[in-house]
């Protein structure tokens, strides 16, 4: 019997994308079965190619589509003469064609299904057309009493048919009242809390400019602030902190990052913000600054950047700066820059910059590190590729 199509339940659409309108297609399939018993089967004397037919059957009294089973007891042709051939035949049909799948089996002495064979797909039937199996079962196996397939000399065939009916479409529109979880606004809310200086409990004086903040937020975000407020330090007792080694704008950008995880002005002050991030153990901000400085490396600033990276233990930035120096040195020797022809007289050599000369005097160990790396480096491909820094 057929099943009426039902629209998708709300739970089916509870995950994944939600469309404004939808369609649910139900392909109707009518399933029914038929049993055919042939009494005194061993007396069937039909020759090869001759046929026995069952009576007609259908899915129900109102179904005008009629079927029958066709058996060739001694096969259909020379190829199948040692087999029993079995087919499903469409006797009459009000439609021009119909598609159906079928399954044949035998019932043994215990009324159990055995030797089942099933169509692998839905076949196209027209009136008078049959589909089945030319070699359904070997005759010698079937006639052997030890196999129990002919109890009392009765052959019982069981057939299951699945007929594809018309498909049904159900369409509609998604309920506009579907719940939507708002996006998280934690960063915006904390940023507003700081900007509005509400419920603050400590003050920072940065070169004369006051900034109010919340101890709990700072302690949660920075191990340095956590230690400052946790112990009986003077800053914790007075709720007042003096900072004289940072510019107010740099401190403000650092605080914005602490509250929101963002630093919109980072590119303008990446070097000074790196120092602040290192001082207050803000590892993610530190790597963000390293990445910004890496993207702006040049012949003129690479030595100063290397010194800055060494001073604040920015190991990824340091490695990138040394790599930049080595690549530029090799490319200069090859007479090219960034994969293009390069006249070395038109560009300042890194070793001739004031930053490099200053580094020789103040940080000679960095010069040694750069030369050691250069000595072990191989000639690179043209261009100066940049590696993406690992975010903490």
UniProtKB/Swiss-Prot annotation:
It comes from the Eukaryota. InterPro entries: BTB/POZ_dom, MATH/TRAF_dom, SKP1/BTB/POZ_sf, TRAF-like. GO terms for molecular function: identical protein binding; ubiquitin protein ligase binding. Residues 31-161 form the MATH domain. The keyword Nucleus applies. The keyword Nucleus applies. Component of a cullin-RING-based BCR (BTB-CUL3-RBX1) E3 ubiquitin-protein ligase complex that mediates the ubiquitination and subsequent proteasomal degradation of target proteins, but with relatively low efficiency. Cullin-RING-based BCR (BTB-CUL3-RBX1) E3 ubiquitin-protein ligase complexes containing homodimeric SPOPL or the heterodimer formed by SPOP and SPOPL are less efficient than ubiquitin ligase complexes containing only SPOP. May function to down-regulate the activity of cullin-RING-based BCR (BTB-CUL3-RBX1) E3 ubiquitin-protein ligase complexes that contain SPOP. Homodimer. Heterodimer with SPOP. Component of cullin-RING-based BCR (BTB-CUL3-RBX1) E3 ubiquitin-protein ligase complexes containing homodimeric SPOPL or the heterodimer formed by SPOP and SPOPL. Interacts with CUL3 and MACROH2A1. This is Speckle-type POZ protein-like. It comes from Homo sapiens (Human).
């Amino acid at each position: 019997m057929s099943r009426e199509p039902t629209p998708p339940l709300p739970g089916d659409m509870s995950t994944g994308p939600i469309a404004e309108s939808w369609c649910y297609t139900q392909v109707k399939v009518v399933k029914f079965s038929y049993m055919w018993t042939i009494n005194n089967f061993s007396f069937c004397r039909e020759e090869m190619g001759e046929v026995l037919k069952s009576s007609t059957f259908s899915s129900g009294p109102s179904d005008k589509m009629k079927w029958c089973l066709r058996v060739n007891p001694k096969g259909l042709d020379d190829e199948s003469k040692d087999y029993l051939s079995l087919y499903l035949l469409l006797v009459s049909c009000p439609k021009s064609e119909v598609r159906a799948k079928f399954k044949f089996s035998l019932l043994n002495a215990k009324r159990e299904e055995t030797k089942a064979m099933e169509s692998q797909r839905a076949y196209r039937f027209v009136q008078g057309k049959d589909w089945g199996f030319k070699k359904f079962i070997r005759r010698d196996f079937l006639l052997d009493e030890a196999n129990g397939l002919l109890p009392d000399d009765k052959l019982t065939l069981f057939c299951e048919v699945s007929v594809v009916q018309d498909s049904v479409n159900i369409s509609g529109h998604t309920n506009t009242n579907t719940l939507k979880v708002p996006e998280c606004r934690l960063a915006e809310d904390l940023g507003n809390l700081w900007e509005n200086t509400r419920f603050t409990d400590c003050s920072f004086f940065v070169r004369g400019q006051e900034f109010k903040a919340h101890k709990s937020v700072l302690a949660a975000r920075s191990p340095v602030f956590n230690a400052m407020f946790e112990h009986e330090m003077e800053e914790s007792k007075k709720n007042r902190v003096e900072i004289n080694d940072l510019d107010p704008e740099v401190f403000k950008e650092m605080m914005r990052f602490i509250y929101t995880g963002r630093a919109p002005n980072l590119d303008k002050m990446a070097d000074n913000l790196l120092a602040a991030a290192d001082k207050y153990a803000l590892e993610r901000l530190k790597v963000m600054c390293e990445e910004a400085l890496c993207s702006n490396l040049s012949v003129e600033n690479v030595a100063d950047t290397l010194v800055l990276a060494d001073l604040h233990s920015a190991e990824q930035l340091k490695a990138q700066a040394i790599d930049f120096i080595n690549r530029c040195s090799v490319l200069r020797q090859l007479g090219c820059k960034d994969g293009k022809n390069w006249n070395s007289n038109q560009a300042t050599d890194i070793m001739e910059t004031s930053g490099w000369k200053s580094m020789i005097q103040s940080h000679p160990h960095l010069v040694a590190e750069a030369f050691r790396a250069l000595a072990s480096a191989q000639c690179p491909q043209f261009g100066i590729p940049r590696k993406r820094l690992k975010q903490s």
